[in-house]
């Protein structure tokens, strides 16, 4: 999993096929098994397959996941969950939500927990968990249909995998960034939180210094809009460049950690077990409460 591959994954939503092929040229894929999840037309997909073959790829496998299954709702019932749910949301894209999802998965698995997970990237199956269903982004379905369908989708995962904890990554942002970049109006986060009730919510922010007033206002926003309060704030290393605010695609720059004291987490906290211990303590309290 090289930096070049990571660049393709991060940018494929707005890269042209020529840019994708150029990026793939940099990858050392000879004699390797290549997995891909196609979100292209058949001609562009074939171009990528041909390039991989010409570069000596050992095998090329199209990933087929639960996210490819068509939306289906058998009844208008919202099922309750017996498993604690940890959700990762963000104020926007490029707030390192996926890094957080991988961090949580790794730490919980290392501690011996059985984890089920639905992530924000279309290639989550490469990391042995489910991608967000495609119909969550399909405008032909109503919000109501998506709420019931996601509830049933996650319930099937719980019944089949029998996890001890479920991790959900919420795509896009919870609110619009500006008039140009609406970030789906936060609808996906609203639909997910209407379908399930997270027991622990991590909110990822753009890089910057934040006041307690801002954090309180953000918590009130999720409390009344998503019906869940924020347990932790995470400050990412990315910040949108002001020169791209009104352009078709925003550009992000990498920045070092800002000073926010102990009230916010950042990438350095992933190097210790303080954060994961806090999460486990909260989930343990949840389990004890359920038993009582």
Kindly give the residue locations of the regions a language model identified:
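Short, flexible helix-coil linker/hinge segments at the edges of structured domains or between repeats
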Residues: 52-88, 120-142
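Short acidic-hydrophobic, aromatic-tinged amphipathic segments that line or gate anion-handling sites
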Residues: 59-63, 262-275
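Walker A (P-loop) phosphate-binding motif
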Residues: 71-118, 215
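Conserved nucleotide-sensing/catalytic segment adjacent to the nucleotide-binding pocket
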Residues: 129-172
């Amino acid at each position: 999993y090289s930096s070049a591959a990571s660049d393709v994954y991060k940018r494929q939503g707005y890269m042209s096929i020529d840019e994708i092929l150029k990026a793939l040229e940099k990858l050392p894929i000879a004699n390797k098994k290549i997995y891909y999840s196609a979100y292209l037309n058949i001609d562009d997909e074939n171009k990528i397959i041909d390039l991989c073959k010409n570069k000596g790829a050992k095998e090329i496998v199209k990933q087929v996941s639960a996210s490819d299954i068509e939306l289906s709702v058998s009844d208008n019932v919202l099922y309750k969950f017996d498993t604690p749910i940890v959700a990762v949301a963000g104020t926007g894209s490029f707030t390192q939500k996926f890094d957080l999802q991988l961090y949580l998965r790794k730490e919980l698995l290392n501690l011996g927990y059985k984890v089920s997970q639905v992530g924000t990237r279309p290639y989550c199956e490469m990391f042995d968990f489910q991608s967000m269903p495609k119909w969550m982004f399909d405008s032909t379905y109503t919000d109501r249909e998506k709420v019931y369908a996601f509830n049933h989708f996650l319930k099937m995962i719980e019944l089949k995998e029998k996890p001890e904890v479920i991790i959900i990554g919420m795509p896009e942002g919870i609110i619009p960034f500006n008039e140009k970049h609406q970030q789906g109006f936060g609808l996906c986060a609203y639909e997910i939180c209407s379908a399930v009730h997270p027991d622990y919510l991590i909110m990822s922010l753009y890089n910057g210094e934040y006041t307690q007033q801002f954090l309180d206002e953000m918590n009130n926003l999720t409390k009344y809009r998503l019906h869940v309060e924020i347990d932790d704030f995470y400050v990412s290393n990315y910040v949108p460049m002001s020169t791209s605010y009104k352009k078709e695609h925003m550009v992000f720059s990498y920045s070092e950690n800002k000073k926010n004291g102990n009230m916010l987490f950042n990438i350095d906290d992933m190097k210790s077990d303080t954060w994961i211990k806090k999460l486990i303590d909260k989930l343990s309290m949840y389990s004890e409460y359920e038993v009582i």
